[in-house]
Amino acid sequence: MPRALWTAWVWAVISAFTEGASDQASSLSCDPTGVCDGHSRSLNSIPSGLTAGVKSLDLSDNEITYVGNRDLQRCVNLKTLRLGANEIHTVEEDSFFHLRNLEYLDLSYNRLSNLSSSWFRSLYVLKFLNLLGNLYKTLGETSLFSHLPNLRTLKVGNSNSFTQIHEKDFTGLTFLEELEISAQNLQLYVPKSLKSIQNISHLILHLKQPVLLLDILIDIVSSLDYLELRDTNLHTFYFSEASISEINTSVKKLIFRNVQFTDESFVEVVKLFNYVSGILEVEFDDCTHDGIGDFTALTLNRIRYLGNVETLTIRKLHIPQFFLFYDLSSIYPLTGKVKRVTIENSKVFLVPCLLSQHLKSLEYLDLSENLMSEETLRNSACEHAWPFLQTLVLRQNRLKSLEKTGELLLTLKNLNNLDISKNNFLSMPETCQWPGKMKQLNLSSTRIHSLTQCLPQTLEILDVSNNNLDSFSLILPQLKELYISRNKLKTLPDASFLPVLSVMRISGNIINTFSKEQLDSFPQLKALEAGGNNFICSCDFLSFTQGQQALARVLVDWPDGYRCDAPSHVRGQRVQDARLSLSECHRAAVVSAVCCALFLLLLLTGVLCHRFHGLWYMKMMWAWLQAKRKPRKAPRRDLCYDAFVSYSEQDSYWVENLMVQELEHFNPPFKLCLHKRDFVPGKWIIDNIIDSIEKSRKTIFVLSENFVRSEWCKYELDFSHFRLFDENNDAAILILLEPIDKKAIPQRFCKLRKIMNTKTYLEWPTDETQQEAFWLNLRAAIRS
């Protein structure tokens, strides 16, 4: 019994393990190229069953704690491995030994407290390694990266426990495109630790305090192109001139991101620019200046200029004591060499005239997302301000008058590019004044409703996107590029107004269509972006767009940007894929064909009516409908005749000389209705026939070959036919005056033919001895 329990327990464990492994393997989604995605799947281990077909494996943001020697041994073609944001605390020595093709490895934000060089000894082609955010204090006892000759991007350190950088740490690395060191709590930096790296393109340094900053800078200043300092409090920073005076520097760009300054530390940083003479660009991003701009009493007067700095960028500068801040006049003399200045989203409402006049080399000025208005712009763009300025960006400020703005900028003689987008202009005056060299103007998102002659005729590039324009009728003879997307235009602009236009962006309007003739009217058009409009996919439009292969080279957003809005059955489809029916595209031909078919149908109907007496049927239907309006059966007192006699004119002798004599002169006499004597003059013949039949108890048909050929006999027979079979009575008496073939009776009198086949009719005897019996039978039939 215990043995059985033990066996059951073992099988349960094996089953659970197998099921778990299967579940984990199924949690990966892999495409045919070998890219497998398993991020954020709550995995607690690396899935089993991985093969050589896997080239990219993403297991980030899971709960993996351990990487074993066999977990990845079959992934010999793996190039990208992402294990970041897990709980990994252990990596076995040979875990990555078989990954000889690995180029990208991310182990960031795990729980690794120790790093081993054996992990990387076979990763000769590794280019990217991220070890940020783990728990280690140092980079190991031995040189960690000595086996990585092709490494180009390295990220190491953490924000808490990483405290020491030793000389051996970066041995073996000669060239890095990017090195990021997170060392907010750095306590020890051994000199020359970074000096072994001969060239670093971009160094990102996270330091909370600046104590060791100068030591690091001394080691890298001759091999570094681009230094980025993050999350640092520079309140206590002091620049020692002696320590760096002998160094040949190569740093070209310096960025301070989320860094705090004081008036004093800012001066120390400016000193640095004089000695690191290669710096061409300085950027302050999301920084805080804890001071009031009081530089006059400091050593700023010993600094003649900002080194060789040509580009100065300031974004989101916070000044807690903004309303106590000085006028900065003491730094004006330092700005003479600066060519490009960007001060963005920093609550700037004024550039003092004196500062503008000192910026003698300035070519580009960006004051986006600030508080500039026409009143302050008047002071900023004063006489002799920014003498060489070519580009001015005043996007998203507080400008309201286009006329005043243009007038205030007349002092800028060299200005050719002006961006005043996202200001609230609303309207445009009829005339304006602009600097004489204006070539580019950005008026996008200014809520203007129409364009006027206010725009300068010298423009080569105009952006009026995202406004309320419903037409474009300006003559701009030099305009080469027009950006007019997201407006309310219904058609392309007139090409005669824009003779040299080469680029037009007109997407997001309400244009229904455009034609080959319209595009051909722009002789120099090379790029057209017209997607996102409400295209009516007519036959002509589809034929044009789908039939012009060269059109794809002009339409930059073809084919995905072009969708049909109508007809409804192709709405939402790409114009390239839409198909219309033959009737929609060849309406005239279809209508002609239908008309021809209708004509043939009418012709055929006429032939059939003639052949099968269709006209007769219609006449009879009309007569029957007329007769239906009268009482179905005349009252007894309205019957005037014993019988109505229907006969052919050729048989009138027999009727008038024999029948009338035998019936009307008999005692008692019969009263007959004959059309010759009893029809009412002036009354329609058809009405006479109908009235006579209805006023007679019987209808006598004198049948002969002449009767069958007589048109009026047919009418009389027709209406009696309706009476007989609509009222279902036996009012008809047939007299066969001479033998006739029953087939000679028209097919349309089917019921009459049936009577002749089923009921007795009187036949006129040629033998005189039998004629008396004939008249006797006829009188009896009339009385019945």
UniProtKB/Swiss-Prot annotation:
Topological domains annotated Cytoplasmic: 609-784
UniProt keyword annotation of Signal present: yes
InterPro entries: Cys-rich_flank_reg_C, Leu-rich_rpt, Leu-rich_rpt_typical-subtyp, LRR_dom_sf, TIR_dom, Toll-like_receptor, Toll_tir_struct_dom_sf
Membrane topology: Single-pass type I membrane protein
PROSITE patterns noted in UniProt: LRR (PS51450), TIR (PS50104)
Pfam families reported for this sequence: LRR_8, TIR
One GO CC term, this protein: receptor complex
Topology, Extracellular side: 21-587
Disulfide-bond pairs as recorded: 30-36, 353-382, 432-454
Known glycosylation sites: 114, 199, 248, 442
Signal peptide residue numbers: 1-20
Gene3D superfamilies associated with the record: Ribonuclease Inhibitor, Toll/interleukin-1 receptor homology (TIR) domain
Places the protein is found: Membrane; Cytoplasmic vesicle, Phagosome membrane; Membrane raft
Residue location of crosslink Glycyl lysine isopeptide (Lys-Gly) (interchain with G-Cter in ubiquitin): 754
Record keywords: Cytoplasmic vesicle, Disulfide bond, Glycoprotein, Immunity, Inflammatory response, Innate immunity, Isopeptide bond, Leucine-rich repeat, Membrane, NAD, Receptor, Repeat, Signal, Transmembrane, Transmembrane helix, Ubl conjugation
Membrane-traversing stretches: 588-608
Ranges for domain LRRCT: 525-579
Molecular functions (GO terms): NAD+ nucleosidase activity, cyclic ADP-ribose generating; transmembrane signaling receptor activity; triacyl lipopeptide binding
Annotated TIR domain residues: 639-782
Family: Belongs to the Toll-like receptor family.
Protein name as annotated: Toll-like receptor 2
